[in-house]
Amino acid sequence: MSGEFPSAFLFPDPALADKEGLLCFGGDLEPSTLLAAYSQGIFPWFNAGDPILWWSPHPRFLLFPSELQFSRRTQKRLEQCAFEVRADERFKEVIGGCQKAVRKNQEGTWILPKIVKAYEHLFEEGYAHSLEVYKEGELVGGLYGVSLGAAFFGESMFSRQDHASKAAIRELCRLGVERGWKMIDCQIHSEHLERWGARAVDRERFLVLLKEALKEKTWRGRWSLN
């Protein structure tokens, strides 16, 4: 799977990851390395002072676009909020919003300057994408991730107003259904994503789904929402 994205850094078999999901460390964050990693079900995640750490957790947390579940109350609230969602207009601001977001039980951020730079390069190459959520012209939320074949790898999201991140996820799933995505990779478990319909899939099954997804067209370049 990594043949399409030659990298000087060769990744081990994802099955060799430890029980926490840590597979290896080192390498770089060049676009070719990141794409080779994603195509093998591997992603970077590390804190300041750490080497570059690469992960392939078991189980994997996935959201299938057609399985998004919002309560009637949430759906009603989203309609009342009347958010506008756009794509790939303010990638740098979206990743910056994710970087600054305060998260429960988390000190600081793993979205370090080198991560920001790496994903900005992927955006320039047409593989990383952002969804921006607006309220009365103001950016109030969004998400970003990587698109390869019929898979979207979600990296992070933020919300400055209640329900803004839900609007981003809803639009992402709508786009996924429209484009025939096999899955949205959420990487690791989170309670709110589980409430929205995401579920755990064992690594072997995830890698089979990924292999199938990579046979499909990659929606590379700037996205425009209908």
From Swiss-Prot:
Major location category of this protein: cytoplasm
Main enzyme class: transferase
Subcellular location(s) of the protein: Cytoplasm
GO biological process, one term: protein catabolic process
Reaction(s) catalysed by this chain's protein: N-terminal L-lysyl-[protein] + L-leucyl-tRNA(Leu) = N-terminal L-leucyl-L-lysyl-[protein] + tRNA(Leu) + H(+); N-terminal L-arginyl-[protein] + L-leucyl-tRNA(Leu) = N-terminal L-leucyl-L-arginyl-[protein] + tRNA(Leu) + H(+); L-phenylalanyl-tRNA(Phe) + an N-terminal L-alpha-aminoacyl-[protein] = an N-terminal L-phenylalanyl-L-alpha-aminoacyl-[protein] + tRNA(Phe)
GO cellular component: cytoplasm
Family label: Belongs to the L/F-transferase family.
Protein function: Functions in the N-end rule pathway of protein degradation where it conjugates Leu, Phe and, less efficiently, Met from aminoacyl-tRNAs to the N-termini of proteins containing an N-terminal arginine or lysine.
Name of the featured protein: Leucyl/phenylalanyl-tRNA--protein transferase
Species, as recorded: Wolinella succinogenes (strain ATCC 29543 / DSM 1740 / CCUG 13145 / JCM 31913 / LMG 7466 / NCTC 11488 / FDC 602W)
Gene: aat
